[in-house]
UniProtKB/Swiss-Prot annotation:
Positions with a binding annotation for Mg(2+): 119
Entries under Gene3D superfamilies matching the protein: 3.40.50.450, Phosphofructokinase domain (3.40.50.460)
Cell compartments where the protein resides: Cytoplasm
Cofactor: Mg(2+)
Gene Ontology CC terms, in alphabetical order: 6-phosphofructokinase complex; cytosol; membrane
Gene: Pfkl
Lineage, top ranks: Eukaryota, Metazoa, Chordata, Craniata, Vertebrata
Stated name of the protein: ATP-dependent 6-phosphofructokinase, liver type
Matches recorded under NCBIfam families: 6PF1K_euk (TIGR02478)
Catalytic activity: beta-D-fructose 6-phosphate + ATP = beta-D-fructose 1,6-bisphosphate + ADP + H(+)
Record-listed E.C. numbers: 2.7.1.11
Length: 780
């Protein structure tokens, strides 16, 4: 990772001009990317131009290319679509069109282009870059530009950001707009589920994605669909019989609805398209079910961007500017990608080539290879989907009994994790119990055996269906041990927040006294605070950030209407500032005070002065976030009083404590999927461990690795022993000692126009696309 020197960076853009355009189909989050590129460009001293209507505007020039200032991109982060317009342009595909485009760029001295669009748009940009030299020669010949102009602007640098709801671009885990499109799909599925259940209907849902099945695959996983059609994995011949058999089976088990998800590019083994109407007619003829088709269409492109898309676009936009500043005539055109939770740069044409290879593999019916080329994330989603879709109640019983409980505060995604863990456990042949009300319930014996159908419909439910308490096990150890013995429990799956982790640690530490605690234990971190060690993301934190973000969007709208108003908003999270920081980036907050980033009265003074200066511009509103425990003395009330008195006559101030709103309603697609995957992986890991420690008819597990936290770390799902994690934990403040997201705070401050030290800015390295990086065994 390259660390950038502040003063050099501050002026590194001096004399450079950057043009930014959006091209191809629109995607939610493009505005956040335009905002980040514009502001980062201005931050480093470059001139930034907005190019309206995509390549069409580039070819036509004139009023379509306008200089941007800091305020040009204010208050756009929450808007869907793209404010600078997008178009699919025929003219740019011709040499004449590109000649006109080159001339228009030279009129403004632009030799750096940031293109936000799909693979077609990015390929076009690369052709433009390769031809740049010959285009200039032609312009000199025609007498349109001078020799000296051609020499001064001899090289064109390109940085691409992939904006496409389809997530069909190889080399990046997620493209801009994909997460928001999934939000729209899940909103529709949730709405359809209620009507389908009322009438016992079957719904065939057609989702977008051209020749890529990502949206269909992930929404099928997140909704627990009965059947799925995607172009990368066409069904075997005779699928009609299998599908009808499956649908009939689920109905006979008591299910009141069936959901079939079909990608718009779905085909059979022979490359023949499978249409939603064909599937509907099939179900009606064979099974006589009341069946309806819903084609989601352009709804998926619309609406406000999700928190993930806003943060992703902001991070990628800033990285694109860094890539343009560091580009030389010899560096290839690059595309900024997401790998795990890091941004990296990849050579544009390598990515385009692999993207084309996928299509070629599908055309040549090499479907397994197509799935592999789609990347690590796609392949793992497909494996988990297949596993869940083919799970059945096991005919053979194992000797093991497992119990599942929720501990801590409710968090979205808990029910998804319980559902997939229960079903995986049952399909492995285990006896599965659920415990109501956490460790307290375990002490009181609130334990019941659970069956396959008992968890139907849990996937999209928010909160905790089992009931959850914050009580730790220490005071109730005798009773807990008694019940573990009574029910003969060999493994515990604890889904919850910091209390879940601390509780399992207490049980492990009591193993010396009670042999019954020498069992396999696993913690699935689920808390809105994202403060459990051993994972980068806790279940429920994505839903919480989205809930806080929606509230802040409304608050910002109120402030915009009132003029000269500053809102101070308090978020939850205990001592952990994750919620405040990420929400702050997603809503374009002016500041976010958190415990991990210590601040004093001088910082507060600087913030108030910054706000006063801001009120003199056209943006007459302010939004300040404060984590609930960021400072023992500088409380929300203190900040309100400070801003009110210092801003007297310039702005007025209001406070808002978001409170339990942040626990969210229905879980976001990310939390549904993440919960489902963690439930499956945790249960499979526990099954394997149980087989390892089963000796002479009994389970005895006392090694450190028999009690773990499962979590996503960078790119892989890892199991970390709770005793090992003890060293990494700050128990007083209930959080990990190291926080990966602290580097995001720099982004928040820069986009809010603070002149801060950038010695800590970490820019992504140029990596290469290889088949190896595309499929890692573990991970998501």
């Amino acid at each position: 990772m390259a660390t950038v020197d502040l003063e050099k960076l501050r002026m590194s853009g001096a004399g450079k001009a950057i043009g930014v355009l959006t091209s191809g189909g629109d995607a939610q989050g493009m505005n956040a990317a335009v905002r980040a590129v514009t502001r980062m460009g201005i931050y480093v001293g470059a001139k930034v131009f907005l190019i309206y209507e995509g390549y069409e505007g580039l070819v036509e020039g004139g009023e379509n290319i306008k200089p941007a200032n800091w305020l040009s991109v204010s208050n756009i982060i929450q808007l869907g679509g793209t404010i600078i317009g997008s178009a699919r342009c025929k003219a740019f595909t011709t040499r004449e069109g590109r000649l006109a485009a080159a001339y228009n760029l030279l009129q403004h001295g632009i030799t750096n282009l940031c293109v936000i669009g799909g693979d077609g748009s990015l390929t076009g940009a690369n052709i433009f870059r390769n031809e740049w030299g010959s285009l200039l020669e032609e312009l000199v010949k025609e007498g349109k530009i001078s020799e000296s102009t051609a020499q001064n602007y001899a090289h064109l640098s390109i940085a691409g950001l992939v904006g496409s709801i389809d997530n069909d671009f190889c080399g990046t885990d997620m493209t801009i707009g994909t997460d928001s499109a999934l939000h729209r799909i899940m909103e529709v599925i949730d709405a359809i589920t209620t009507t389908a259940q009322s009438h016992q209907r079957t719904f065939v849902l057609e989702v977008m994605g051209r020749h890529c099945g990502y949206l269909a695959l992930v929404s099928a996983l997140a909704s627990g669909a009965d059947w799925l059609f995607i172009p990368e994995a066409p069904p075997e011949d005779g699928w009609e019989n299998f599908m009808c058999e499956r649908l009939g089976e689920t109905r006979s088990r008591g299910s009141r609805l069936n959901i079939i998800i079909i990608a718009e590019g779905a085909i059979d083994r022979h490359g023949k398209p499978i249409s939603s109407s064909y599937v509907k007619d099939l179900v009606v003829q064979r099974l006589g079910f009341d069946t309806r088709v819903t084609v989601l269409g352009h709804v998926q492109r619309g609406g406000t961007p999700s928190a993930f898309d806003r943060v992703l676009s902001s991070k990628m936009g800033m990285e694109a500017v860094m890539a343009l500043l560091e580009a030389t005539p010899d560096t290839p055109a690059c595309v900024v990608s997401l790998s795990g939770n890091q941004s990296v740069r990849l050579p544009l044409m390598e990515c385009v080539q692999v993207t084309k290879d996928v299509q070629k593999a599908m055309d040549e019916k090499r479907f397994d290879e197509a799935i592999q080329l789609r990347g690590r994330s796609f392949e793992n989603n497909w494996k988990i989907y297949k596993l869940l879709a083919h799970q059945k109640v096991s005919k053979e019983k194992s000797n093991f009994s497992l119990a599942i409980l929720n501990v801590g505060a409710p968090a979205a995604g808990m029910n998804a994790a319980v559902r997939s863990a229960v079903r995986t456990g049952i399909s492995e042949g285990h006896t599965v119990y659920v415990v109501h009300d956490g460790f307290e319930g375990l002490a009181k014996g609130q334990v019941q055996e659970v069956g396959w159908h008992d968890v139907a419909g849990w996937l999209g439910r928010g909160g905790s269906m089992l009931g959850t308490k914050r009580t730790l096990p220490k005071p109730h150890l005798e009773a807990i041990v008694e019940n573990l013995r009574t029910y003969n429990i060999h493994a515990l799956l604890v889904i919850g927040g910091f209390e879940a982790y601390e509780g399992v640690l207490q049980l492990v530490e009591a193993r010396g006294r009670y042999e019954e605690l020498c069992i396999v234990m696993c913690v699935i971190p689920a808390t809105i605070s994202n403060n459990v060690p051993g994972t980068d993301f806790s279940l429920g934190s994505d839903t919480a950030v989205n809930a806080a973000m929606e509230s802040c969007d409304r608050i910002k709208q109120s402030a915009s209407g009132t003029k000269r108003r500053v809102f101070i908003v308090e978020t939850m999270g205990g001592y952990c500032g994750y919620l405040a920081t990420v929400t702050g980036i997603a809503v374009g907050a002016d500041a976010a005070y958190v415990f991990e980033d210590p601040f004093n009265i001088h910082d507060l003074k600087a913030n108030v002065e910054h706000m006063t200066e801001k009120m003199k511009t056209d943006i007459q509103r302010g939004l300040v976030l404060r984590n609930e425990k960021c400072h023992e003395h500088y409380t929300t009330e203190f900040l309100y009083n400070l801003y009110s008195s210092e801003g007297r006559g310039v702005f007025d101030c209001r406070t808002n404590v978001l409170g339990h709103l942040q626990q969210g309603g229905a879980p976001t697609p990310f939390d549904r999927n993440y919960g489902t995957k963690l439930g499956v992986k945790a249960m499979l890991w526990m099954s394997e461990k149980l087989r390892d420690v089963y000796r002479k008819g009994r389970v005895f597990a006392n090694a450190p690795d028999s009690a773990c936290v499962i979590g996503l770390r960078k790119k892989v799902v890892a199991f970390s022993s709770v005793t090992e994690l003890k060293k990494e934990t700050d128990f007083e403040h209930r959080m990990p000692r190291e926080q990966w997201w602290l580097n995001l705070r720099l982004m928040l401050k820069m986009l809010a126009h603070y002149r801060i030290s950038m010695a800590d800015y970490v820019s992504g390295e140029l990596e290469h696309v290889t088949r190896r990086t595309l499929s890692i065994d573990k991970g998501f």
